[in-house]
Regions:
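Subset of outer-membrane beta-barrel
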Residues: 1-353
């Protein structure tokens, strides 16, 4: 299980501000159910969203120039609970699958207000509620080059499918002087949210169970999916339109070094870790590609040693993430991740002599 806390620095046109938040990351368990068969289950966030910012400008109405402010906010996300199994049909080859239940709510809003209170405030509130499933498939092969040198090759695939959500848009006109609100709800039977085809491939090199280095490359084909779109002219029309998403690609490199996992000297049992990644955007903002992302992390796996257990690990890492795109807000995030890996003896067979 694990949790994280982060500080994000936002920068635009020379102006900066900081935002802080924390989150629960995961709770996962795995065990051997039978020879060559393993089972895993857990609760993990699938998506999270949270923002609130505004953009100011001027608007001319008749002979009057007014200050206008667009306030953007978003909240919610999808949760994921899964059950998985892995099987080794022959030596070196393993295959597995996870079936997940996804649920959650997503809300986004844009509010346009003016400096003159006699001018009505306009708001658009978008919402979707998801209850669906997700399927993940995987395979890996362990290649033994020698007693101390091993290579693991892996591949994952998640098929695309419709997850529904019943997207809905509520537009409102608010007269701030009279407090009169006029609202209109837009929806459509053909509107939905989708998950794309997702592919992943990678390898890990393992030297004497001491040095491990690896790379992963993933592709999420968002660019092949339509997006529920509501007419911008406030008419009651909606449709599924292509061109708002992009195919996302991500490359991750990482390594771990543990001098001697079962050495009597404590510092030799610590796991030292490092990694970097680069990802392209998966969406467009006002017709322009969204922010790219780079990250780097350093961490430690500290053994927890007591009379009953010497295999559990306290995992601590620091991560820096930068997101940027020309003409958009730049984000620099520093994140602290803390996790516990319990390797308990729950399924050990006791022998009585």
């Amino acid at each position: 299980m694990g949790a994280s806390g982060q500080i994000t620095n936002l920068e635009e046109n020379g102006k900066k501000m900081n935002a802080r938040n924390s989150s629960f990351d995961y709770a996962v368990a795995a065990f051997r159910a039978a020879p060559h068969l393993g089972v895993s289950f857990g609760l993990v966030p699938f998506t999270t969203m949270g923002y609130n910012f505004n953009a100011s400008g001027t608007t001319t109405l008749g002979n009057e120039t007014l200050k206008s402010t667009n306030t953007y906010s978003g909240d919610g996300g999808l949760h994921q609970v899964y059950l998985g199994a892995g099987w080794q049909p022959v030596k070196g080859l393993s295959v597995g699958a996870n079936i997940s239940y996804l649920w959650g709510d997503i809300t986004k809003s844009v509010v346009l207000s003016f400096s003159n209170a006699s001018v009505s405030t306009l708001s658009k509130n978008y919402s979707a509620s998801v209850a669906s499933y997700k399927l993940d498939l995987g395979a890996q092969y362990l290649l033994s080059l020698s007693d101390k040198n091993k290579v693991i090759l892996g591949f994952t695939y998640s098929p695309k499918h419709k997850i529904g959500g019943n997207p809905e848009l509520v537009t409102s006109t608010i007269n701030t002087n009279t407090s009169v609100v006029v609202s209109d709800t837009l929806s459509g039977n053909g509107l939905r949210l989708d998950l794309p085809d997702m592919y992943g491939a990678g390898f890990t090199y393992n030297y004497d169970n001491s040095l491990k280095v690896g790379a992963d490359f993933t592709v999420q084909r968002w660019g092949k999916l339509p997006q529920p779109t509501f007419a911008s002219d406030n008419s009651s029309t909606s449709s599924m339109q292509y061109g708002n998403y992009l195919t996302r690609k991500k490359l991750t490199l990482g390594g771990e070094y543990c001098p001697r996992e079962y050495d009597r000297i404590f510092v030799r049992r610590v796991h030292y870790r490092a990694g970097v990644s680069y990802a392209t955007p998966y969406y467009k903002i006002n017709g322009n590609n969204g922010p790219k992302e780079v990250s780097a992390s350093l961490g430690f796996g500290i053994p927890i040693v007591n009379s009953m257990n010497n295999r559990s690990i306290l995992n601590i890492s620091g991560q820096w993430v930068r997101q940027w795109a020309p003409g958009m807000i730049k984000e620099n995030t520093f994140r602290i991740n803390i996790g516990l890996t319990f390797n308990e003896r729950w399924f050990m067979k006791w022998k009585v002599e």
